[in-house]
Amino acid sequence: MKTFIRIAEIWVPTEDRTELRYHDGLYGTHDEFRALSQQMRFKYNEGLPGKAWATGHPVIFRELEDSNFKRTEAAKAVGLTCGVALPVVADDVLKAVVVLLCGDGNVGAGALELWHNDPSKFFELRLVDGYYGPAVMFELNSRHTGFPRGYGLPGRAWKSNMPLIVNDLNDSRVFLRWKEALDIGVNRGLGIPYLHPSGRTWVMTFLSARNTPIARRFEIWVPTQDRETLIFHAGDCDQNSEFATAYKSAKIEKNDGAIGQAWASGIATARASLAHEKSVVAQSAAAAGLSAMLEQIQVDFTHSLHA
């Protein structure tokens, strides 16, 4: 079973902060696309990474044939259809941009959504843009839906200012569009809030379909009160629903494995292989048959995607 996210990339500013350069990534078998990416640079507001740098919030390209996307032909050759860029910011300074490039094969598509609240103009979250694949009616419904603070997956992530994982979107108390989601096979969701210095809020939602899950596992780790270690907060895995029991007493220190390195550096980390990763997270993932992981850090939490 293929995941909806096919390629993950990490871009970081050059020393003079005039461009973004390639840092690391997960490409599976797409070595030619990796080689092309390693040669590229993105200026401020250029391409998908540069747009996220310029805006300071997530950006969706619902079509990679968009003239703003700089690797159109290469993306088409490996079946990529859409992408999202997630800025990693600390103290108003860009540390990295994580780019997720997706392909659904037009079967059982998942969805990517970007929601926005501007308190000077409206009280709820409104859809900025989204990718829905063949789910036309679900897209239409979403474009005419708003979420007050605390309501639905986007609204609850906004209220808590924490990522929210929902492993059963059939629960109408959590996911207000559950009937439409059921019709297209979407059954899991992840919401990630992004607070902007302007006071505006963006929420990125990943809706996972049974046939093409966004990723095989999501994990959220948060700092302890003394901020000396990270502890497990929430997660979901389609390979082992009981995986969290192994984390009950687990603590991750800075530089301990991929998550600890992301926390220490403030930059996302990628692991194309878990063979030499000794952390409790990597061992749990490997035991579930997962082979790669991406860690992204934000101020008060890290979140992990596994394939």
Per-region residue spans from a language model:
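Short hydrophobic/aromatic beta-strand element in the GNAT-like acyltransferase core
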Residues: I7, P49, T72, A85, ...
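A short, aliphatic-rich beta-strand micro-motif
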Residues: T81-V89, R188-L195, S291-V299
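Short loop/turn motifs at secondary-structure junctions and domain boundaries
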Residues: K2, M40-K43, D66, A74-L80, ...
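Regulatory sensory and allosteric helical modules in signal-transduction proteins
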Residues: P13-S67, F122-G130, P134-S172, E228-G235, ...
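Regulatory loop-to-helix N-cap segments in sensory/regulatory domains
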Residues: R34, R41, L101-A109, E139, ...
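Short hydrophobic alpha-helical segments used for membrane anchoring or interfacial signaling
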Residues: A8-D16, H23, E113-K121, R126-V128, ...
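Sensory modules in modular signal-transduction proteins
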Residues: M1-I7, V107-L112, P119, P213-F218
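Flexible loop/coil segments at beta-strand boundaries within sensory signal-transduction domains
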Residues: V89-L94, N106, L195-R200, R227, ...
